[in-house]
Amino acid sequence: MTSFNDGRTVRVVIPARYGSTRLPGKPLVDLDGEPMIVRVHARVRRALPDADIVVAIDDARIAEVLDARGIRFAMTDTGHASGTDRAAEVARVSGWPDTDAVLNVQGDEPLVPTALLQAFAGFCGAAPDLGVATVACPIDEVALLDEPAIVKVVVDHRGRALYFSRAAIPFCRDGRPADSAGSHGLFLRHIGLYGYANATLQALASAAPCELEQLEKLEQLRALWLGMPIDVMRWPDAPPAGIDTPDDVARVVSLLKRQTHDATEPY
């Protein structure tokens, strides 16, 4: 188990769903000789060597790969609609205390920086009143404000989320800034890394989807709808994108090869 400054214990769940419309069997896709889920687990383990890490799966084929490598996993309900639901099941079945922090690290992000994982674990572990936490970075290209695939978040003076949207928020009534969007400190891009107090995670997973969540297709809006505060940790830049399609595989493999050649972790 990992704790920070005598704070709360931090645990990690990596959801891995076998069925993917755009990339069937995604957790087991080969990335330069290793299945993707193995690489994600290795990245998390390198960042948090003492943490309790569980891969939440839904298929025996993933179990076989993980078992052969001695990686801890939990078989979860195949009917879950999201990784949050899988993380909640693992935390509940494992009997983790309500106050423990549960990090949800997406299983299709093999290039998530270890420094980001370490910083976020520390952020969640040290938070005195953790409910939900996530990450955002500056938007440094004005054009990204109009990109629906880039989720934007607006925060208050405490660093808590006011709203997430695929639309350009905040809206500039007098026209877009001429320089980089990020220089204003108001235009933030959401990074899909989450941390929860286990009690909050269970409450969130048991609640029905809200209308805003269904409209924007953004699960985190459920927490705001329920009145749950979301603390946003700022990070300087966006990590490399994860894997959703076959084209993404070649891009990630190229970055992995470069990383190995450089003997560093720039990605």
Curated annotation (Swiss-Prot):
GO BP: any one term: CMP-keto-3-deoxy-D-manno-octulosonic acid biosynthetic process
Subcellular location: Cytoplasm
Pfam families: CTP_transf_3
EC number, UniProt record: 2.7.7.38
Spans through the membrane: none
GO CC term, one of those recorded: cytosol
Family classification: Belongs to the KdsB family.
Protein's UniProt name: 3-deoxy-manno-octulosonate cytidylyltransferase 2
Lineage, top ranks: Bacteria, Pseudomonadati, Pseudomonadota, Betaproteobacteria, Burkholderiales
